[in-house]
């Protein structure tokens, strides 16, 4: 799960596994610092990504679930349709100082999988498409984003080849996020 704080709006990308709910409310409270959660984006309907969606939307009754939400009324019949906002490829959320652009996933873990792109950080949230990229001598998985080596994106390309091409729009990607780092 990731939390993005814009100057005007906030969005949580993926909600984490329901087994981690015990720590999520406290962490969100600390990170939001009195602000509210405006949006929740779930990349796809798999438990590690959507496990806390119902509880989050219950805790933040003004928050809207955005993304490919065509089936979500079946999973969460308690939600009003006004809280489910279907986003299409290329549509954006304006958070103030940054935008989140929704993209059709090139690799779909499940039908309805979407990716998100943060225009400020130039960061692609690629659901499960890219896996973990690190060498055994580096403990990248236990590192916070701000602690990571500045050249991580360049070095990652030395160790992984992405077997696809043909993005519909050219986007500068400085970092890729697959799962929490």
Question: What are the language-model segments listed below?
Answer:
Residues 20, 45-50, 72-75, 91, ...:
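Active-site environment of divalent metal-dependent phosphoester hydrolases
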Residues 13-15, 37-45, 65-68, 124-128, ...:
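Active-site neighborhood of phospho(di)ester-bond hydrolases with catalytic His/Asp-centered motifs
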Residues 20-65:
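Active-site metal-binding motif and surrounding structural segment of the metallo-beta-lactamase
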Residues 26-28, 55-58, 79-82, 138-141:
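Short, glycine/charged-enriched secondary-structure capping and boundary segments
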Residues 132-181:
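Cap/insert and terminal regions of metallo-dependent hydrolase folds
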Residues 63-113:
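Metallo-beta-lactamase
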Residues 1-30, 115-118, 122-126:
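Conserved beta-strand hairpin/beta-sheet module of binuclear metal-dependent hydrolase folds
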Residues 77, 105, 111-115, 126-129, ...:
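A short secondary-structure junction signal
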